[in-house]
Amino acid sequence: SGALESQPLYINDNTDPNSNSPIEIESFSSFSSSFNTIEFGPEVSLTIPSLLFINTNKYENISNTRTVFSASLNYQRRLNKAKLDFERGIQELTYGYAWSVKNKYIHQLDPISFSAVEVNKSAEFDDRINSLNDKLLAASFQNHIISATRYRFIYSDPASSNNGRTSFYYDANVESAGNILNTFYKITDRPRDATSGAYKIVGIQFAQYIKTQHDLRMYNKINDKSSFAFRFVGGLGIPMENLSDALPFEKSFFAGGTDKTRAWKARSLGPGSFRDSSVVFDKIGEVLLEGNMEYRFDLLGFLDGALFVDAGNIWLANEDSLRPGSDFKVNRFAGEIAIGAGFGIRVDLEFFIFRLDVAYPLKNPSLVVGERWFFQPKDEYNTYLNTLEFPLNVPGLYTPQINFGIGYPF
């Protein structure tokens, strides 16, 4: 798989920290936007139709048993004005099991998943990160190793099994990385790195975290020509001792993009109500909440239409003095939910669906309370823009986003 996307950087001299898997081609606000990021990820796997080393004879209800050995490579390269910002390469080896129960429940267990992540940064990009004095951002762009165990549960209830109109889908996963390694290193009294205070494998720090994500969907068929689709996604990741500043970049949550909160570019929303006054990098978080609703209907022949509303955001799990408003608070998070709406055209060619969605931001949580909705005055925000040396470089608050994709967003 692969993708091209536009991730422009907007830089201003005001550095006051107290200022408030469908295949996709990333959203962009105009056809003149340049693609500056390339990403591809080949994968090979060997599937054996049984659970190796496990006796399944006493389990009557399981079927479709599989043992999977896989190897994958993910490469990402981003440019800034034709110059390299960074390259990231991820090599992963996985050994896992999968099986079904009663043709409704799918279980996937990966006892061993080993990844090596190498980041090559330009000197200019590294200087920009260091100048921000942001430990979370710096931790996201460092070399590391991930030794993880994963479990995934999928429940699928087709419409034919209940009233013929409503179907449900639930996808939950949990992942633990580095915890066994960290415990082993402690028990065996291994030395820590003198500079970082962390344990390392062959000179590379290993990540330590726990992470879970839950995806619940409901599809309601109104008639043969129209239906509703709903989705709710929640996720939480907690970085732990050996890499405690942040989750690894590739394991972090993000908002925006072609199948999330479509009125924002991928990784341009959040975290929380934090307003980035110095530079727009990839915005990532450790807490994710998202809800989507679509009304899908036939138009003409192979053309279908959709009206949709997206809501969501990301947050940090802990308070960050450099990012006020970025942490998740029970008494504050509801007001920090971004909301967008739009319409889409889908070309249904049976073997795949080509999708074009146009989304408009209705509520922007990076603004102060009283200015977040599109119809509210923007006095404080306009004052803020006047403090910047290059205010025209800041993207517009309510610019429609055009998204292209293959397949439904959910």
What is the predicted role of each segment?
Residues 35, 282, 286, 330-338, ...:
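Short amphipathic alpha-helix initiation/capping segments at coil-to-helix junctions
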Residues 305-308, 353-359:
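Conserved active-site loop/cleft motifs that coordinate metal ions or position small ligands
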